[in-house]
From Swiss-Prot:
One cellular component (GO) term of this entry: plasma membrane
An annotated GO BP: phosphate ion transmembrane transport
Binding site for ATP: 39-46
Source organism (scientific name): Streptococcus pyogenes serotype M4 (strain MGAS10750)
Protein's name according to its UniProt entry: Phosphate import ATP-binding protein PstB 1
Length: 253
């Protein structure tokens, strides 16, 4: 029996200043899977990711057509509360971006915005989220130190914990390891594989090795088109399109 997708993208196009940068993309995200989005720079991967939790709304020059259905309704309908949407569909960016405050306050930031003040609830959220991001043991004795003083890899895992604290169902990651050293990147990858048990993840990556190690499905983008999408193993072993094969084998990028 086929698993139902948790999110369905249909005929999504994104225009910047009337220029079509994402072209009629249709893609499903499935529960407890990691979907990798690959392709050269400027191919539309990050644009798609930012469309899934309406981050592109912050740019007045962007126009979007098509639909993204989550929880039974189109997230681009006027009745969507984007604040609530971004709690359920969290985002982790390329550069670690902890707030200039303590590790503890970074993690509870979203909960405080919701008006939660109960210390026991906040304490539990901090511990469970930092454990989920595989960094609790490294920071549990210095929760009130500045998050900015952590290493880049630790900062990125605190950013993941900050997303986890709002109890999302989907986590979007835009090249989350590209600014990190190989050891830190490896820890992030291990964390993502653990998170897959409880969440749905979509990751933009420029590393074919990372895509093959982490993802269940892969979508290949070229010049705004989703040229090919399917199970990662099948795509990497036997791509249907020559462009996909050329990109995966490093003939262009």
């Amino acid at each position: 029996m086929m698993t139902e997708p948790i999110l369905q993208i249909r005929d999504l196009s994104v225009y910047y200043n009337q220029k079509k940068t994402l072209k009629d993309v249709s893609l499903d995200l499935y529960p407890n899977e990691i979907t990798a989005l690959i392709g050269p720079s400027g191919s539309g991967k990050s644009t798609l990711l930012r469309s899934i939790n309406r981050m592109n709304d912050l740019n007045p020059e962007v126009t979007i057509t098509g639909s993204i259905v989550y929880n039974g309704h189109n997230i681009y309908s006027p009745r969507t509360d984007t604040v609530d949407l971004r709690k359920e569909i969290g985002m982790v960016f390329q550069q670690p971006n902890p707030f200039p405050m303590s590790i503890y306050e970074n993690v509870v930031y979203g909960l405080r915005l919701k008006g939660i003040r109960d210390k026991s609830i906040l304490d539990h959220a901090v511990e469970s989220s930092l454990k989920g991001a595989s960094i609790w043991n490294e920071v549990k004795d210095r929760l009130h130190d500045s998050a900015v003083g952590l290493s880049g890899g630790q900062q990125q895992r605190v950013c993941i914990a900050r997303v986890l604290a709002t109890s999302p169902r989907i986590i979007l990651l835009d090249e989350p390891t590209s600014a990190l050293d190989p050891i830190s990147a490896g820890k992030i990858e291990e964390t993502l594989l653990l998170l897959k048990k409880d969440y749905t993840l979509a990751i933009v990556t420029r590393s074919m090795q990372q895509a093959s190690r982490l993802s269940d499905r892969t979508g290949f983008f070229l010049e705004g088109d989703l040229l090919e999408c399917g199970p990662t193993k099948a795509m990497f072993m036997n791509p249907k399109r020559k462009e996909t094969e050329d990109y995966i084998s490093g003939k262009f990028g």
